[in-house]
UniProtKB/Swiss-Prot annotation:
Name of the protein in its database record: 2-(3-amino-3-carboxypropyl)histidine synthase subunit 1
UniProtKB keywords: Cytoplasm, Iron, Iron-sulfur, Metal-binding, Nucleus, S-adenosyl-L-methionine, Transferase
Species classification: Eukaryota, Metazoa, Chordata, Craniata, Vertebrata
Pathway: Protein modification; peptidyl-diphthamide biosynthesis
GO cellular component: 2-(3-amino-3-carboxypropyl)histidine synthase complex; cytoplasm; nucleus
Gene name of the record: DPH1
Region (Disordered): 1-22, 388-409
Species name: Gallus gallus
Record text on subunit structure and interactions: Component of the 2-(3-amino-3-carboxypropyl)histidine synthase complex composed of DPH1, DPH2, DPH3 and a NADH-dependent reductase.
Family, as annotated: Belongs to the DPH1/DPH2 family. DPH1 subfamily.
Catalytic activities: L-histidyl-[translation elongation factor 2] + S-adenosyl-L-methionine = 2-[(3S)-amino-3-carboxypropyl]-L-histidyl-[translation elongation factor 2] + S-methyl-5'-thioadenosine + H(+)
Length: 409
């Protein structure tokens, strides 16, 4: 597409009165003496100025918690800054800093278990949203730092105006790093366009994940994604196959229309479901990379397979590779409780069907095949107990009748 050529903290109990709200503000407010600390400002100057690592807030929270060992976890794209941040923390607090170097794909990879095993009493997770609640990391204080990235929003706005007619209905989405930029852009565009910044709770407005995206109104003219890469964009494209999608890369300032092979993906996933429906022995893969695996989903699948008389084996893996699964000759079909995109994007690389929990529900007759394909893995409102945040998990004493497999042969 053409572009114009121009140069997480400790929880506080809610209160019904204003005093409670004031107390919360006081507890969360970074002291002025820390914000204005000349030495701290000089130290922060070693980090890129357009990346907000929230160093004063981090120092303040560590001091508040009285932490002695702080674990730092971040995606590989930010690891180059880890040593600098660790040095700052050790200089301005009484804590020792430990950098966790294992791969971190997303907010689902929050690794409080390893942090505790290392003896840490405080974990700072960078670059992702609060997918795992801070009160779920027992025995470990936690802080999420989104690492908001400042960009040239004027060029982004000019690009939108150059490519879309006034009055168009636009859905603006991004990853957590650019959500603030999306919000600012939506305010600027509202006078000329019908702008929507959709939300799929518990995510922030405008935020999408590779496995979780909202369904949009049918009269939406275009999806505009602000970010580099396609992984997250593909999620909302899968959830909204009839809406044209565009990507603005804030680094290269390139604006492009993006396409997705929906029919090919649907065909591949339906073929895997048909094959799995005939399987005798099932393998249940629980991802152990941080918090990727959901024990609740695992328990639900175990209950369903028992009710249907299907033998199964449980396997725990941090990362799932075809060569590893080939070692299990007796397993006829796999269900991986880790990342749905592993099956969607790479399922054909495996010799046996590798289903998502949703696809397993289809194969077992618990739900019909959905159009469009649901991208609701972490959504608060999801289709059923094969998603991570589904709360109404019905008892399985009286499971649905054993499905007819004719439609999946």
């Amino acid at each position: 597409m053409a572009a114009p050529q121009r140069s997480g903290s400790a929880a506080l109990l809610p209160s019904a009165n204003g005093a409670g709200r004031a107390a919360r503000r006081t507890a969360r407010q970074v002291p002025e003496e820390l914000l204005n600390n000349v030495e701290l400002r000089e130290a922060v100057g070693a980090l890129p100025s357009n990346y907000n690592f929230e160093i004063p807030k981090t120092i303040w929270r560590i001091r508040q918690a009285g932490a002695k060992k702080v674990a730092l976890q971040m995606p590989e794209g930010l690891l180059m800054f880890a040593c600098t941040i660790a040095d700052i923390i050790e200089r301005f607090t009484d804590a020792e800093a430990v950098v966790m170097g294992d791969v971190t794909y997303g907010a689902c990879c929050v690794d409080d278990y390893t942090a505790r095993a290392l003896g840490a009493d405080f974990l700072v997770h960078y670059g992702h949203s609060c997918l795992i609640p801070i009160d779920a990391t027992r025995g470990l204080k936690m802080l999420y730092v989104f690492v908001d990235i400042k960009i040239d929003t004027s060029h982004f706005l000019d690009t939108i105006r150059f490519n879309f007619a006034v009055g168009s209905s636009l859905a603006l989405v991004s990853t957590i790093q650019f959500v603030a930029a999306v919000q600012a852009a939506s305010q600027e565009l509202q006078s000329q366009y019908k702008v929507c910044v959709p939300q799929c709770k518990p995510l922030s407005p405008g935020e999408i994940l590779g496995c979780t995206s909202p369904r949009l109104a049918r009269d939406t003219d275009a999806i505009v994604y602000l970010g580099d890469g396609r992984f997250h964009l593909e999620s909302i494209m899968i959830a909204n196959p009839g809406i044209p999608a565009y990507r603005y890369d804030p680094y290269s300032k390139v604006f492009s229309q993006e396409h997705y092979a929906h029919d090919r993906m649907h065909g591949a996933r339906q073929a895997a479901i048909r094959s799995a429906a005939r399987a005798r022995c099932w393998g249940l893969l629980l991802g152990t990379l941080g918090r990727q695996g959901s024990p609740a989903i695992l328990q639900h699948l175990e209950s369903r397979l028992r009710a249907l008389g299907r033998p199964f084996v449980r396997v725990l893996l941090s990362e799932i590779f075809p060569s590893k699964l080939q070692l299990f000759d007796s397993v006829d079909a796999w269900v991986q409780i880790a990342c749905p995109r592993l099956s969607i994007d790479w399922g054909e690389a495996f010799s046996k069907p590798l289903l998502t929990p949703y696809e397993a529900a289809v194969a077992l007759g618990d739900i019909e095949w959905q159009q469009p394909y649901p991208m609701d893995f972490y959504a608060s409102q999801s289709l059923g107990p094969w998603t991570a945040n589904h709360t109404a998990r019905p008892a399985q004493e009286k499971p649905p009748a054993t499905p007819s497999l004719k439609k999946w042969h």
